[in-house]
């Protein structure tokens, strides 16, 4: 118990900082950083330096843990939980002890750029465009009325204003349907509001 209470984290315990990368880094980035640092402090290049062997072993251990998906997940869990015990001791604990401390874990960093979300959203308009092209090619006398009938279907289709039992569209999207951007010049009242005259 005293070891846990008197524990002070060392810089060598933060494998990401040791390798000079981030917790969101890919395996390729981790390997690239490892190669750079390993060349700088390799024991064969510095035979007179006694700390070179120790530093190289720490780098090797950090690379092994962070390049393996399972051990990296365990390390990230330990690191985010900020437990006051070394990672090796955390690894030795039973899984039941680790699970009982699930509440103590901070969430993972958010990505700065979204990767796959943009490809999905850009594929939807392309699909609609291709359907419009097909209707123009397949039906030479297609008119705007037929195009209006082919509008995208929404989940609110089962809701009809004629049916008194169903909620109206205004109940679902009241804010969305009421507010419209206008291209007209702003009113005098709006101008006064923007200029803090009201």
Swiss-Prot record:
Gene3D superfamilies from the xrefs? DnaJ domain (1.10.287.110)
Q: Which residues are in the J domain? A: 14-79
Q: Hey, what tissues is this thing expressed in? A: Highest levels of expression are detected in kidney, pineal gland, and raphe nuclei in the brain where it localizes to serotonerigic neurons.
- Please state where this protein is localized: Cytoplasm
Q: Phosphoserine-modified residues are where? A: 160, 166, 182
Renumbered residue ranges of the record's region Disordered:
114-177
Give the record's GO CC terms: cytoplasm
* Skewed-composition ranges (Basic and acidic residues): 126-156
What happens without the gene?
Answer: DNAJC12-deficient mice show hyperphenylalaninemia and central and peripheral serotonin deficiency, with reduced levels and activity of PAH, TPH2, and TPH1 in liver, brain, and pineal gland, respectively.
Instruction: Give the N-acetylmethionine positions (modified residues).
Output: 1
Broad class of where this protein is predominantly found: cytoplasm
Residue ranges, compositional bias (Polar residues): 116-125
SMART domains (UniProt xref): DnaJ
Q: Which domain of life is it from?
A: Eukaryota
Q: Which InterPro entries match?
A: DnaJ_domain, J_dom_sf, JDP1-like
Keyword Disulfide bond listed: no
Keyword presence, Cell wall biogenesis/degradation: no
Q: Which UniProt keywords apply?
A: Acetylation, Chaperone, Cytoplasm, Phosphoprotein
Role played: Probable co-chaperone that participates in the proper folding of biopterin-dependent aromatic amino acid hydroxylases, which include phenylalanine-4-hydroxylase (PAH), tyrosine 3-monooxygenase (TH) and peripheral and neuronal tryptophan hydroxylases (TPH1 and TPH2).
Task: Cite the record's note on assembly.
Answer: Interacts with HSPA8. Interacts with TPH1. Interacts with TPH2.
What is this protein's record name?
Answer: DnaJ homolog subfamily C member 12
- Organism of origin is Mus musculus (Mouse)
The primary gene name is Dnajc12
């Amino acid at each position: 118990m005293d070891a846990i209470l008197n524990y002070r984290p060392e810089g060598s315990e933060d494998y990401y900082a040791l390798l000079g990368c981030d917790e969101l880094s890919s395996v390729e980035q981790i390997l690239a950083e490892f190669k750079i640092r390993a060349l700088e402090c390799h024991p064969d290049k510095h035979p007179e330096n006694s700390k070179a062997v120790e530093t190289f072993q720490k780098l090797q251990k950090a690379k092994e843990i962070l390049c393996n998906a399972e051990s990296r997940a365990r390390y990230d869990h330990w690191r985010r939980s900020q437990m006051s015990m070394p990672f090796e001791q955390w690894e030795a604990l039973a899984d039941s002890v680790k699970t009982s401390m699930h509440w103590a874990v901070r969430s993972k960093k958010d990505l700065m750029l979204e990767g796959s979300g943009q490809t999905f959203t850009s594929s939807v308009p392309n699909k609609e465009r291709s359907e419009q092209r097909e209707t123009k090619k397949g039906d030479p006398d297609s008119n705007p009325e037929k195009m209006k009938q082919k509008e995208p279907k929404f989940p609110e289709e089962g809701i009809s204003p004629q049916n008194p039992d169903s909620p109206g569209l205004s109940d679902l999207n009241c804010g969305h349907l009421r507010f419209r951007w206008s291209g007209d010049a702003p009113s005098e009242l709006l101008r006064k509001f923007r200029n803090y005259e009201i």
